[in-house]
Amino acid sequence: MKRLPAVAGSFYESDPKKLKMQIEWSFRHNIGPRDIPKQTYEKKKRDNLFFVVPHAGYIYSGPVAAHSYYYLVSEGRPDVVIILGPNHTGLGSYVSAWPKGEWETPLGSVKIDEEILMQLVKESEVIDLDEKSHLYEHSIEVQLPFLQYFFDDDFKIVPIVIMMQTPEIAEFLADAIYNVMQKNPDKDIVVLASSDMNHYDPHEITVKKDVEAIEKIQQLDYKGLYEVVEGKDVTLCGYGPIMVNLILAKKFGKKAYILKHATSGDTSGPKDSVVGYLAARFGS
């Protein structure tokens, strides 16, 4: 079963050569890390297990996303990347995993880790196997070219989209991921929470709203983050995935480190209506 790219040519370049140049542009951008990370091939225990990455078009959020990937790549190639994204389309079930096969992008194909996936399904009791949720969803797809640029096809993924973004669902998923990671100590597993921040307010308002959410992220306060999103009109689209990583970070004794916060007004667009972007890592 192959999942074909839905947003190649719109969110990112469809030509492989141009796409690689776009990824390099993201790293070298003045909002980005300004350098391309050197990949280590030395196998050692990973410190940064969990990340927040944005998922807009690369010209807008690529430089911010590059900060998270800089840290991920610097610690070497993971065996498995669990990618949690919000469900923008409204299709499919409340929590949906792509069941098997591979995902294709202009840079090639990446296989699903079916063994880890089925362990998660068994542990969580809330994950459905459902392709429909993923067919047109961009929040996971846009992460793959960044990973493929450095690791080619030498890693596997578990793609999960979350429509019901509640603290209770986040707890179920975090418990399942934690248990699976504990049962597979020899597998190098990383979890990406794919999310943009506040949407379509002027730059100054977006920054103010985002800061309220970022404070909760720094405190690993997943219920507080939920309250900010629900109670203060912060239109953060992937708060469910972020809540999962906040719970996981606390379980593993990690701290939150904000790598970069910017808006589309900082990267490529006007500042009268912007989207906020955050790169964060959770490590020692």
Swiss-Prot record:
Pfam families registered for this protein in UniProt: Memo
Transmembrane segments: none
Coiled coil: none
Domain of life where this protein originates: Archaea
HAMAP family registered for this protein in UniProt: MEMO1
Protein family: Belongs to the MEMO1 family.
Protein name: MEMO1 family protein YN1551_0739
Organism: Saccharolobus islandicus (strain Y.N.15.51 / Yellowstone #2)
